[in-house]
Regions:
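Conserved catalytic cores of very large enzyme subunits
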Residues: 1-496
Length: 496
């Protein structure tokens, strides 16, 4: 209307929008060291979404949708985290314009699949009208704005840790932290081994829920949010804050990660130990303890030393500073024999030769899907103090790096205390059950999106993945030379 009356021009409206984009980048969130590792980058999570549907199922794309994309192109700044909802009614040119933004290398927008997210939210009790009007809160988590208290980053759950507990019979650094599922070297079938993993997983999930629910109660008692509660239905009419369960929809959403490592680990164990019998479980366990052919790294030396010292203290011995130094020195000198080292190298090579997840191999991809169920299905039976349900997500942000640093070697050949694989969101996973969101980042060379033909192929890639019921995609478009030059001259690459 203002355009028709001459009150504002399209160009000046675009400039105002660009200014809002700049203003959003005035903010910064200073994180502690642990949070900075888990949420690496300029992650303020001010999410703005365009496209999608209204409550009646009509496409809501309009001129402002394109102007928002253009604003991100113009300012080349990380905020807002622009997202695009994609469904079978999305205008093709909206997707082309979004692809043009992706081509700039800014890492935006994120693409979300209505055909998966809406049914996933319906499965969590949202009405159809509310599910159709979902938006993204934070990183990749869908919810109905103004009606939800989702606590979408309630925890990060490393799926490799229960596997470590299977090999240690529930022990960690000399303490029983899991359940005792038996001596792994005496498990005669793969089914027995996999069942032990599932039991450790369920127990770890119960610990997570207990911790999260305790924190939830503490939030309600110690850090009430009266202003936010005024903005969320039905807090006022119920006379309850969001922390007390005043919102219409209440959830707790812990994120699981490490699916790729787990799929490869389970397949390798089944193949090498139980089917081909090329490696005994005793050898596998020993290889993991020694970190394959790498030997004990600094973190392993520290962990073993602490375990020995704790055992000495528990036994009534007086542990002095000199004692601690002597133990540390002794552990540092520990090395596998030449024969052990040769065998560990052979085992690691055999693991490398075993087929891996992500290569359209059904036997391996089955484990990825099943491990996801092992995490998500037990999770959804729990409830929080606000009367809401637990709902799982499958993504690590960047927590796979610090939490991988706390994880020993894994049976897929990953060395101790290195990052756990982040890739989890592929089409063969059941995204309908992961209503707290998934994350699937990919990297492309700029030449892949060159010209109109490159954009068309890129849009087809997204549509194909979404036709296979994937939930989310996001892309980095940059070449190696640019990244190397950015390390030398960061002032030239403020947009990266």
């Amino acid at each position: 209307a203002d355009l028709d009356k001459g009150i504002i021009t399209r160009e000046s409206a675009q400039e105002l929008l660009d200014c809002i984009w700049v203003k959003l980048n005035d903010l910064n969130k200073v994180r502690d060291a642990a949070s900075a590792e888990g949420f690496a980058g300029y992650s303020l999570f001010q999410n703005l979404i365009v496209g999608g549907q209204d409550k009646d199922g009509n496409d809501v794309t309009n001129d402002l949708s394109v102007m928002c994309i253009l604003a991100s192109m113009h300012v080349h700044l990380p905020m807002p985290s622009l997202s695009i909802r994609v469904w079978n009614g999305s205008p093709h040119e909206l997707l082309i314009k979004a692809a043009e933004l992706t081509r700039t290398g800014i890492g935006l927008p994120a693409y979300y699949n209505d055909e998966v997210i809406i049914p996933a939210l319906l499965n969590r009790g949202l009405t159809l009208a509310d599910a159709r009007e979902y938006n993204i809160i934070g990183c990749v988590e869908p919810q109905k704005a103004g009606k939800t208290d989702g606590w979408h980053d309630a925890a990060f759950f490393n799926m490799c840790r229960p596997l470590e507990l299977v090999f240690s019979n529930g022990m960690d650094k000399g303490e029983l932290v899991g359940i005792q599922t038996g001596d792994v070297t005496k498990m005669t079938t793969f089914e027995e081994f996999y069942d032990a993993y599932k039991k450790q997983m369920e127990y770890c999930i119960s610990l997570l829920v207990n911790a999260d629910n305790a924190i939830d109660v503490a939030h309600a008692e110690r850090v009430p949010l009266p202003f936010e509660s005024c903005m969320v239905d039905d807090c006022i009419s119920r006379g309850l804050s969001v922390q007390e369960g005043g919102a219409i929809y209440n959830f707790t959403g812990p994120q699981g990660f490490g699916i790729a490592n787990m799929a490869d680990s389970l397949y390798a164990i089944r193949k090498l130990v139980y089917e081909d019998k090329k490696v005994s479980m005793e050898e596998y366990k020993e290889a993991l303890a020694w970190n394959y052919d790498k030997g004990l790294d600094e973190q392993s030396v520290k962990d073993i030393s602490e375990m020995i010292l704790k055992g000495m203290q528990d036994g009534g011995m007086n542990v002095t500073e000199d004692t601690a130094k002597a133990v540390l020195t002794t552990v540092m000198r520990l090395k596998p024999t030449e024969e052990q080292l040769r065998r560990f190298t052979e085992i690691h090579h055999m693991i490398d030769e075993v087929p891996k997840y992500g290569n359209a191999i059904d036997d391996v991809d089955y484990f990825a899907r099943d491990v996801a169920y092992t995490y998500t299905r037990p999770m959804q039976k729990y409830h929080n103090p606000r009367g809401g349900q637990y709902q799982a997500g499958l993504y690590p942000v960047s927590a796979n790096v610090p939490l991988g640093g706390q994880t020993g070697a894994t049976p897929d050949g990953r060395y101790a205390h290195t990052p756990v694989a982040a890739a989890s969101s592929v089409a063969k996973l059941d995204h309908f059950i992961v209503s707290n969101g998934t994350l699937f980042n990919q990297k492309f060379h700029p030449s892949a999106l060159a010209g109109r033909e490159g954009l068309e192929k890129f849009v087809s890639l997204i549509q194909t993945f979404f036709d296979q019921k994937g939930m989310h995609m996001q892309f980095n478009v940059v070449d190696r030379e640019t990244l190397l030059d950015a390390q030398k001259h960061p002032e030239k690459y403020s947009h990266l």
